Amino acid sequence: MKKVIAIIDIGKTNKKLFLFDEKFNVVFNNSKKFEEIKDDDGFPCDDIEAIENWIQNQIKTIQETGNFKIKAINFTTHGASLLFLNKEGKRITPLYNYLKPLNLDDFKNLYKTNGGVDEFSRKTASPAYGMLNTGIQMLSIKANKPRIWNQVDAILHYPQYLSYLFTKKITADFTSVGAHTATWDFDNMQYHSWLKDENINLPEPCKGNEAVMAVINGENIAVGTGLHDSSSSIIPILAKEKGNDFVLLSTGTWIIAMNPFSKETLTQEQLKNNCLCFMTPEKQQVKSSMQFLGRIHEVYLKELSDYFKVDLNTHLDLVLSNALCNELIDENATVFLSEGIDTDFEAHHEILNKFPSYESAYYQLVYEICKKVILGIDLITDKDAKITTVYISGGFNRNKVFVEFLSLLKPSVTIKMSDVKNESALGAALLMKNYL
């Protein structure tokens, strides 16, 4: 039987299982989408019971089939999600949706007693995002659902809850508590004092390569504590680039620049410019810039396609014009992004009248996006830093125009494409390598 590490990779849309062999190649994978249900307030949420059953059945089926010997299991999930347990260790809440609206005025006392919204957000590296801050979720349950709160004995972030299903151990990890939770004091690298003031006790985080031995369906298996997916995605490149500082540009709907080498604490200027911090499994801050630029690109691709009557993916077939790139850099015009970037961003159709061709419009759009990306990278780079490489992962690493503009606007660094697939799952697997 082939020895493997099983990874449960939970996204908002797809729930996946991967098996990695001793060379960290994927030898099996499976995925499933789940219908949402309603929480106790009637708001849509993931069906945690169905997800639990699926995970446990997947592991059991692999064991029974006999083709693979599972030596370790680990978990990676999206952030901003908590589960609450009672004294009997039973889950007493649904998996509340982090998109659920909250009135931040209900928490003004927390901010007021801890230096105000700006200072509290800076210190915890957590912009005031409502439900996206799991610390705020805790206070919301405490204030609005006392019947539930009075039963709470333990609070787990999503990855640690999945680990708990197999180990029955209450754990925490640095990547989860460090992901815009408003519970972690990044100045002192410990839990923030407000938790003690509110009589909220959270488990001390452990390092990501620690595991608990558990008997699962009669077999001894090392079970990791799990980790946050964004932090997990940077682990494979950290392993590859030992001794070299780099920034990872994770590109999708959001373009997130992640710098795991920043030593400086988050500033108010950075916070106001869409910067925050994550943490590595070893308790190292990952200063990050998070911008909604992928969405802008997506919206204007549709407008360009309609206006110039071409295929939606025409941009991928454009012949790279270095001369046009340099011409636009010299002109330094702002056409598409003269206003702020909102999450409900809509295209301005009339702008396209300025352009004689699809190519000229698309190049201008990407130039402006790249300028924003470079500003984000510069914001998260320490003054004395020696960043030599920018890795691009996600959809934009196939975009020749995007890569060319980045190279021209940031000539001091080498632009590389991340060839790693399933980065989050691989990162979680690498942490379990000692148990293979």
Predicted regions and their residues:
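N-terminal glycine/serine-rich phosphate-binding loop of ATP-dependent small-molecule kinases
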Residues: 1-94, 151, 220-225, 387-388, ...
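Active-site core segments that coordinate phosphate-bearing ligands/cofactors
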Residues: 7, 112-126, 139-152, 157, ...
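Residue-level signal for inorganic ion chemistry
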Residues: 24, 73, 100, 141, ...
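Active-site phosphate-binding/coordination module
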Residues: 62-133
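Glycine-rich beta-strand-to-loop/alpha-helix junction loops that act as flexible
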Residues: 76-81, 208-210, 251-254, 389-397
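Nucleotide/phosphate-binding loop and acidic/charged catalytic motifs
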Residues: 100, 172-178
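A charged, well-structured terminal subsegment
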Residues: 133-139
